[in-house]
UniProtKB/Swiss-Prot annotation:
Entry protein name: Probable electron transfer flavoprotein-ubiquinone oxidoreductase, mitochondrial
An example Gene Ontology CC term for this record: mitochondrial inner membrane
Location relative to the cell: Mitochondrion inner membrane
Organism encoding this protein: Schizosaccharomyces pombe (strain 972 / ATCC 24843) (Fission yeast)
Database matches in InterPro entries: 4Fe4S_Fe-S-bd, ETF-QO, ETF-QO/FixC_UQ-bd, ETF-QO/FixX_C, FAD-dep_OxRdtase, FAD/NAD-bd_sf
Residue positions binding FAD: 93-107
Reaction catalyzed: a ubiquinone + reduced [electron-transfer flavoprotein] = a ubiquinol + oxidized [electron-transfer flavoprotein] + H(+)
GO terms of molecular function: 4 iron, 4 sulfur cluster binding; electron-transferring-flavoprotein dehydrogenase activity; metal ion binding
Keywords per UniProt: 4Fe-4S, Electron transport, FAD, Flavoprotein, Iron, Iron-sulfur, Membrane, Metal-binding, Mitochondrion, Mitochondrion inner membrane, Oxidoreductase, Transit peptide, Transport, Ubiquinone
Record GO biological process: electron transport chain
Length: 632
């Protein structure tokens, strides 16, 4: 008999229909129900008495539009929906996020449970329409954790996986580039270039082979708590809600997933992870996280320009001396070139646009000669952790733990975080299986073993050894001072010093008044190497359902005038997707009206991080919405 996994079912009929299917076919009546009989989507829809969603809008290179609903009205209406009872699905382990960390944890739990002859049900909730659709990285992957998790992975590697052949390092000025030594931490012998989106899809398929249940288009939007304050699970957001927060004809309440342990693997600055960190004061003994914004494109280039396996990084232009960042260009697969720029979000100048800095960076001959004659296929942007050792929060709390970039394990010196994220998932999984062996797991688990054991792995050792590199760029010497200190650290000190440098204290606070700077006149795109933001965002395949609540909450209505006058529209500059803009409005006291084009959001989280007033709040939109990355 043929079977359809729950993950495939969710993809076939849409997330909102799975609740009804599970309810009517028979939800978790027993632990053996890991697969459902194979049927056509239409048959399954008859079972659930639902209809497929038809309300998507695809963003192209077109004029932006936005709805304007009063935040108070929307909040009041959504609050009323919270009184409606949710369907509850009881599982053993709930993982929020089907990225490398979450999937590694899921696979490891299944592996270790099988060895111990236990049945542990693992459910992974993913807000994207498919695993990998929201995954963005360079990516050059160090296979340390992958070798541990799946020792034979090279026999069936991810698509376009390419062994690194050689490294390059360049210092750029506007029209020239100069070779500089490759630091030891950035030498990539034994590593692999690949698309993180493709890698994540591949890893998700491996997880399903182990019996992991992956539910794509399930956007976890709320953490659920017991009466004693411990985490009992999460709830997904509601379907069929209009822009005013009122139920539509196809309304369906979100689903609750209860578990003795919930792992948060949302990636950098996840919305639920942010709330967990605040509620349990997990940053009480560490510094605030600092972030970078990575903006990238994937190109296909002519044979004569292509050097398969080459990994290149750049310093210098277009970054100013007070702005941390650098470029990269990786060549992999079938003539694919991934080119990008990471800009530290602690930059002070509100006129800086990371997305436009990236576009003009490609005009440097170092990049232009490779991209010439090629075709830009995809565009992506995502915030990444740069705080390192100093910014790691407490990882555990009653009923759950933070893993991967939800905690922040990126090694800035290596420009890598996938291997450390995966290792954190592996260590958390081992702690969970051990806890299930000691306990019936009928109550929330406290995974203290996970945190203690992770501190004894290469994850913490790596981050400790390079802890001073990123904050060294904060001195009055700026990037030049940071590069000099980093060279001494890399070749001489190697982290063996009695001091630990500090970060600035938050990226939002680093933003200075526009009065201290001159506006930046970025060159117009040539539509050959450089492109405008609407064209770029169209290459992210971003989709959002029409007539749903705006997932970007602006809590600053009384402060918008002062914010604009002080920072001159910084929101429009830091957003890489054209979500925020100030349009002329004679009726306004300052001649402008703040507009949120939420349908263009690529889920990078920059607004929630960089807004100087910390009044913009990013929340999960309807499940399955957002970008549809395939090669990023």
């Amino acid at each position: 008999m043929s079977y359809l996994s729950r993950s495939a079912l969710a993809r076939s009929v849409g997330a909102k229909h799975l609740t009804g299917v599970l309810r009517k076919i028979g939800r978790r009546g027993g632990r053996s129900m890991h697969v459902l009989p194979l049927a056509s989507p239409s048959t399954l829809l008859k079972i659930s008495s639902q209809t497929l969603r038809q309300d998507f809008t695809v963003l192209g290179a077109r004029n932006f539009h936005s709805s304007s609903v009063r935040l108070n009205e929307l909040t009041d209406n959504l609050r009323k929906l919270d009184t409606i009872e949710r369907e509850v699905e009881d599982v053993d382990v709930c993982i929020v996020g089907a990225g490398p960390a979450g999937l590694s944890a899921a696979i490891r739990i299944k592996q270790q449970a099988a060895k111990a002859n236990r049945d542990i049900r693992v459910v992974v909730l993913e807000k994207a329409a498919e695993p990998g659709n929201h995954s963005v990285s360079g990516a050059v992957i160090q296979p340390t954790a992958l070798d541990e998790l799946l020792p034979n992975w090279r026999d069936d590697p991810p698509e376009n996986c390419t062994a690194v052949t050689h490294d390059k390092m360049k210092f750029l000025i506007p029209k020239l580039h100069f070779p500089i030594p490759v630091p030891p931490a950035m030498k990539n012998h034994g590593n692999y270039v690949m698309s993180l989106a493709e890698f994540t899809r591949w890893l998700a398929a491996k997880a399903e082979e182990y019996g992991v249940e992956i539910y794509p288009s399930f956007a976890a939007s709320e953490v659920l708590y017991n009466k004693d304050g411990s985490v009992i699970g999460v709830a997904t957001n509601d379907f069929g809600v209009d822009s005013k927060g009122l139920p539509k004809d196809n309304f369906e309440r979100g689903m609750a997933f209860h578990a003795p342990v919930t792992l948060f693997a949302e990636g950098a600055h996840g919305s639920l992870s942010k709330s967990i960190i605040k509620r349990f004061n997990l940053r009480g003994n560490c510094e605030p996280q600092t972030y970078g914004l990575g903006v990238k494109e994937v190109w296909r280039v002519p044979d004569e320009n292509f050097r398969k396996g080459e990994v290149a990084h750049t310093l210098g232009w277009p970054m100013r001396n007070d702005t941390y960042g650098g470029g990269f260009m990786y060549q992999f697969g079938d003539n694919y070139v991934t080119v990008g720029l990471v800009v530290g979000l602690d930059y002070p100048n509100p006129y800086v646009s990371p997305a436009l800095e990236f576009q003009r960076m490609k005009q440097n001959p170092f990049f232009a000669k490779v991209l010439k004659g090629g075709k830009c296929l995809e565009y992506a942007a995502r915030a990444l952790n740069e705080g390192g050792y100093q910014a790691i929060p407490k990882l555990v709390f009653p009923g759950g733990a933070l893993i991967g970039c939800s905690a922040g394990f990126v090694n800035v010196a290596k420009i890598k975080g996938t291997h450390t994220a995966m290792k954190s998932g592996i260590v958390a999984a081992d702690a969970i299986v051990d806890a299930f062996g000691r306990d019936a797991a009928s109550k929330p688990l406290l995974l203290n073993d996970y945190e203690e054991n992770l501190k004894n792995t290469y994850v913490f050792k790596e981050l400790y050894s390079v802890r001073n590199i990123r904050p060294s760029f904060h001195s009055f010497l700026g990037n030049y001072g940071g590069m000099a200190y980093s060279a001494v650290e890399a070749y001489v000190l190697k982290g063996r010093v009695p001091w630990t440098l500090k970060h600035k204290g938050g990226d939002a606070k680093a933003t200075k008044s526009a009065s201290k700077y001159k506006p930046i006149n970025y060159p117009k795109p040539d539509n050959v190497l450089s492109f405008d933001i609407p064209t770029s965002v169209s290459r992210s395949a971003t989709m959002h359902a029409e007539n749903q609540p705006c997932h970007l909450f602006d809590h600053r209505p009384k402060d918008r005038k002062s914010c604009f006058e002080t920072y001159k529209g910084v929101e429009n500059k830091f957003c890489p997707a054209g979500v925020y803009e100030y349009v002329n409005d004679e009726a306004s006291s300052y001649g402008k009206r703040f507009v949120i084009n939420s349908q263009n959001c690529v889920h990078c989280k920059t607004c929630d991080i960089k807004d100087p007033l910390q009044g913009i709040q990013w929340k999960t939109p309807q499940g399955g919405d957002g970008p549809k990355y395939t090669l990023t």
